[in-house]
Amino acid sequence: MSRTAWRSYARPVPTIEQSDRINDVCIVKPDKYGDERGVFIETYRRSWFPLGREMVQANRAERQAGAVVGLHYHLHQADYWTVPRGRARVVLHDLRAGSPTDGATLCLDVDADNALGVFIPPGVAHGFASLTDLTISYLVDSYYNPSDELGVAWDDPAIAADWGLTDPVLSARDQANPRRADLGANVRPHANLRR
């Protein structure tokens, strides 16, 4: 296929599902296009996502198997995650007071083979377990702001997450996160968060 033909090849919109567990979370199931050279996957398009969010920064993290990162949450920032290498157990928990899904937890496996993307709105706590060595890529809709980088305990029984690991490695920061019941009113997210 010529370079011009490749560019003009019409690609359908991937399957984008609203989570039935947590409001405003979207799971993207992209189409894969392959030929003798390999595979092409469109992983992000701004028009796919709700809330009029525009991603402004791309980040990449690499973790060894056995690590848990999180749970983190933001009052203002949305995230979009993909896992181009390895396998992650993604854990999401709705912390938003007033949300019809407040208190719900969603766990899903995201990896290079299924190529899923996960849109995470503000107020939804998020983390992942490295089931293998992995690379996680994430787009965010605001620049890093330490005052909007909050956390909740990854092992809180009220969250009841299945991380898929028995003895994970965590950062000191993530080990010190408070339980959901101990979050102060000033850091508890609310439904319909906007910038």
PLM feature spans:
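Conserved metal-binding segment of the jelly-roll/cupin
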Residues: 110-132
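Non-catalytic, conserved peripheral segments adjacent to functional cores
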Residues: 2-116, 135-138, 142-195
